[in-house]
């Protein structure tokens, strides 16, 4: 198990908040973001943990840090997230309600004249 800390970081993007997970040697091993939107909404954005540091509680620590920050500073706002199947149970435990299902689609862009 790796010792790590979570710090809040400043971003250059307006209304974007982020947290970084660092090892005790200050190696970045994870991050999580959120964006404050119009109409008192907060979009929970991407979270990432380096492959070699997964399954050590880093994602949960990042998520809980962001959650505590939101509860302290954004009472009355509505938080939402586009969730992968692996995170749905955590969101349910936090009281999130399921919305519509969304399907990921992709296409390689080609200059077809």
Show which residues each predicted segment covers.
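Short, low-complexity Ser/Thr-rich regulatory SLiMs
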Residues: 34-38, 51
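Conserved N-terminal entry element of GNAT/NAT acetyltransferase domains
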Residues: 1-10, 111-113
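Conserved active-site alpha-helix within GNAT-family acetyltransferase domains
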Residues: 83-103
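A short, internal acetyl-CoA/4′-phosphopantetheine-binding micro-motif in the GNAT/acyltransferase core
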Residues: 46-55
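Conserved beta-hairpin
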Residues: 14-30
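Conserved GNAT acetyl-CoA-binding A-motif
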Residues: 70-84
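Conserved acetyl-CoA-binding loop-helix of GNAT-fold acetyltransferases
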Residues: 55-68
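Conserved GNAT-family N-acetyltransferase fold
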Residues: 19, 30-32, 42, 47
């Amino acid at each position: 198990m790796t010792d790590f800390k979570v710090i809040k970081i400043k971003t250059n993007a307006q209304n974007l908040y982020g947290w970084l997970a660092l090892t005790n040697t200050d190696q970045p091993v994870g991050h999580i973001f959120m964006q404050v939107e119009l109409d008192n909404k907060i979009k929970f954005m991407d979270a990432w943990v380096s492959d070699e540091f997964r399954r050590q509680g880093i994602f949960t620590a990042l998520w809980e840090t962001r959650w505590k920050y939101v509860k302290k500073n954004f009472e009355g706002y509505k938080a939402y997230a586009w969730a992968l199947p692996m995170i749905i149970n955590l969101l349910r435990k936090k009281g999130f309600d399921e919305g519509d299902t969304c399907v990921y689609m992709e296409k390689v862009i080609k200059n077809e004249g």
